[in-house]
Amino acid sequence: MFETVKNMDDKFCNLSVGFIGKTAGIWNKQGFAKEFKLLEGNPLESVSWRGVDIGFLIADGREKEDVNNLKKAVEAAKNTGISVLIPILISVEQIEVPAPLLTINPENYAGESDIYKNIYQAVKSIYDVACIPGLVNLDLCDVQAVCNDKKKLLLATGEAEGEKACKIAAMEAINKLTKQNGKAQSVGTTVLLNVTGSEANLSMYEIQDVSETIYDWLDDKQTAIIWGASIDESLDDVIRVSILIGE
């Protein structure tokens, strides 16, 4: 019923993802599933989360038992003093859990594969920010600044290539955030922004372009934008922009 995915970088952080109910089986059918190593472990047991810096819990809110188990798993993880815990719930309704919840509304996606691709992008964006050394480093403390003491999270990733790729990728991420919450531009006091690209395709100019696009979008110009930049040579000419906001 339960499986745990763990991706470890001893130098920077330990990020783990727990699956509740059928979500593990669906995740494993996706092409990107092999990017994470599966571990045996029950996310409802605190021992599974010991030593974890950043934890994700994925559940399907359309299964009532899964919602209850998600809440239990959150408590189990929190009992270990985990630095950051992000539950991800596939649900049309907003449900409260004792941790900052990222809700994935299935009605906003084309199908199951699209839903899980979005979840994968959420996990990967946080992993890239906190666990991979970058051109301009963000770290665990930056993720904590946005997530801790929050009830809800908004997280989106945009990608583009070619002319004005940075601005286009930023706008794609913004559009996804707006789809999650029509008032996304005004809900947070701190925004975490990460720009990823190949070394040949990413400079301070591109990063500044993205930052200005996000700044112009935000209602409150006093909102703190914590930004970083990561190098990923596999992206070639693609620029990836990830935005995290806590409510």
Spans of features found by a protein language model:
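Tubulin/FtsZ superfamily GTPase core signature
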Residues: 1-247
